[in-house]
């Protein structure tokens, strides 16, 4: 019988490098598609189930529009909104640094098409003593828009 004096760890290292590659590739796919938006703070917020948030409209600080995390022009967004049903649920995620005019423009598009079921994403403010890590981003129900 052959006696093993030492263990060959090269196959183990090969497997670990393959697993590391898979993890890094997977992590890069997960991080893509997230739009960095600094949402405003609110003292009250009502949490939603994510399946209720069918359509997501995002405005970044540099006035970029996104529909369901994909860039879109204002004209294309208007055409898209025109195709929606009047009872369509919409979530607005607007950066705190964006101008109020950006908010008014989006809500005006929704009002023209009589879409009134609108929620606004805000960050729940846990108080002045709370740190940044203790804040949660939750969509809060807004007052329906009026035409």
UniProtKB/Swiss-Prot annotation:
<keyword id="KW-0997">Cell inner membrane</keyword>
<keyword id="KW-1133">Transmembrane helix</keyword>
<feature type="transmembrane region" description="Helical">
    <location>
        <begin position="10"/>
        <end position="30"/>
    </location>
</feature>
<keyword id="KW-0813">Transport</keyword>
<keyword id="KW-0653">Protein transport</keyword>
<feature type="topological domain" description="Periplasmic">
    <location>
        <begin position="31"/>
        <end position="147"/>
    </location>
</feature>
<dbReference type="InterPro" id="IPR014171">
    <property type="entry name" value="TonB_ExbD_2"/>
</dbReference>
<keyword id="KW-1003">Cell membrane</keyword>
<feature type="compositionally biased region" description="Polar residues">
    <location>
        <begin position="131"/>
        <end position="147"/>
    </location>
</feature>
<dbReference type="Pfam" id="PF02472">
    <property type="entry name" value="ExbD"/>
</dbReference>
<feature type="topological domain" description="Cytoplasmic">
    <location>
        <begin position="1"/>
        <end position="9"/>
    </location>
</feature>
<comment type="subunit">
    <text>The accessory proteins ExbB and ExbD seem to form a complex with TonB.</text>
</comment>
<dbReference type="GO" id="GO:0005886">
    <property type="term" value="C:plasma membrane"/>
</dbReference>
<dbReference type="GO" id="GO:0015031">
    <property type="term" value="P:protein transport"/>
</dbReference>
<keyword id="KW-0472">Membrane</keyword>
<comment type="function">
    <text>Involved in the TonB-dependent energy-dependent transport of various receptor-bound substrates.</text>
</comment>
<dbReference type="GO" id="GO:0022857">
    <property type="term" value="F:transmembrane transporter activity"/>
</dbReference>
<dbReference type="InterPro" id="IPR003400">
    <property type="entry name" value="ExbD"/>
</dbReference>
<feature type="region of interest" description="Disordered">
    <location>
        <begin position="125"/>
        <end position="147"/>
    </location>
</feature>
<comment type="similarity">
    <text>Belongs to the ExbD/TolR family.</text>
</comment>
<keyword id="KW-0812">Transmembrane</keyword>
<protein>
    <recommendedName>
        <fullName>Biopolymer transport protein ExbD</fullName>
    </recommendedName>
</protein>
């Amino acid at each position: 019988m052959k006696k093993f004096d030492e263990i060959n760890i090269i196959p183990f290292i090969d497997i670990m490098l393959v697993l590391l590659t898979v993890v890094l590739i997977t992590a890069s796919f997960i991080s893509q598609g997230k739009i960095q938006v600094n949402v405003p703070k609110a003292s009250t917020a009502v949490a939603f189930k994510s399946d209720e948030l069918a359509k997501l409209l995002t405005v970044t600080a540099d006035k970029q529009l996104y529909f369901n995390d994909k860039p879109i022009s204002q004209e294309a967004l208007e055409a898209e909104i025109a195709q929606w049903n009047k009872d369509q649920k919409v979530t607005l995620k607007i950066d705190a640094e964006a101008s109020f005019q950006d908010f008014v423009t989006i809500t005006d598009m929704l009002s023209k098409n009589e879409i009134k079921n609108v929620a606004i994403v805000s960050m729940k403010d846990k108080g002045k003593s709370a740190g940044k890590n203790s804040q949660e981003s939750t969509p809060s129900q807004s007052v329906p828009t009026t035409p």
